[in-house]
Amino acid sequence: MILNIIIAIIMIGLIVLIHEFGHFIVAKANGVAVVEFSIGFGPKLFGIKKGDTEYCLKLIPFGGACIMLGDDMLTQSDDGSEDENGEDEDSDDLPAKERREELLKNYDADKAFAAKTVWSRIAIIAAGPVFNFLLAFVFAVIIIGSVGTDPCTVDVVEDSSPAAAAGLQVGDEITKINNNGIAFSKEYAFYQAYHASDTMNITYKRDGQKYTTTVTPEYRKLSVYRLGITISDNTLVASVSDNSAASKAGIEKGDVIVSVDGVKPTDDNKIPQIINNSGGKEIEMVVKRDGQDVTLKVTPTLVESEEYYTGFDSYGYRVKVSPAQTILCSFKEVGYWIETVVKSVGMMFTGKLGINDLSGPVGVVDSVNTVVEQSKPDGAWYVCLNIFQYIVMLSANLGVMNLLPLPALDGGRLLFMFIEVVRGKPVKKER
């Protein structure tokens, strides 16, 4: 667990550091003096001054900072911008003046962030999120170049299902659902999760030819045996409901299910299926926890449920692709995560997602622990690849979230700069 915490810290630290490096490199390219570029935060361990910049290593190796001359300390109005009435702003903020004068003793005022053109400032601020997208792209190339991509190939079609009635067959590759491009298996899963009842106009490829069909999900009520857990990637316990059969039996979030009554889960025989087939009798479940096999006894409970059923699924098997396709698929991979984050933010505003659906640092550590434990049987390289996949998601997430037009975020600053472009002069800074 300690190792996984360290991995999570390094991951988040790398993502934040690359974000700040984006600001740094574009600021330098635009002639802005970077007062300090630091790795980590907290007390400074040591620093080296080179040119305008002091390069620092700080105590806590988590993230970094890029502090530019004139960024926050030198304002637009300090450099001669006008207030709303076109008059010079008169300032009696002596502490601010003293800070400004102290800085100008050591730096050329022309190198201040605030002294640069609005388009230079926009480029500098936008560079942080852009570098996050570039980091996500680099890791996507590593992943797809190593193990391939996961096209939305139909891996199962149940008899007498809506999918079977629509003519879908195993091996068909879905490319569009309701005019939404589908490049990956996970895109279908995301779409179905939030549009389960929608009729799907599907475009798919079969033997090199394109076809279209319509799948209308079937609403049905079910009586099924359940444990009160949610499963991720077929074997991982993603959550355990309070006071459920699983909770009472000692099953924990993060457990990896090895077998149920001696039956190992497969893509064709998934855990919910195995549990439901028990008929409510006590079953023996073997889970892997902290590298050890743990055997538990649990009795499923009968649950009334309802669902919209299509009768087909895609398991996300990886397929190797050419170098050119690797680059193209990597762009699409980053685009998928950007789109997913944007849609998720929209769902928060519409109430489809709540604050409890967000993950903070503790959630990241839990996820890393889960990813590592689940990947261990496949070897160290697959552990790394799964961590890289998590970096792709987190880096794209940070890039998008930083572009939101909110105070203290890059997006909030960019909003005022674009207003400046329209107005032809800076927005007055409120005291």
What do the predicted segments below correspond to?
Residues M1-N4, A8, K116-I125, N132, ...:
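Residue-level signature of transmembrane alpha-helical entry/exit and packing/kink sites
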Residues L103-W119, V224-K248, V256, V263-L398, ...:
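Functional transmembrane alpha-helices
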Residues L3-E101, M401-R423:
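Small-residue-rich helix-interface/hinge motifs
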Residues D71-D78, E158-Y219:
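Juxtamembrane extramembrane loops of integral membrane proteins
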Residues I122-D155, Y188-S241, S247, E284-V286, ...:
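PDZ/PDZ-like peptide-tail recognition elements
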Residues G64, E89-D159:
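Internal alpha-helical transmembrane segments
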Residues N30-V35, V147-A164, Q169:
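Alpha-helical transmembrane signal-anchor/signal-peptide segments
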Residues A163-S185, A246-N269, V334:
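Conserved PDZ fold ligand-binding element
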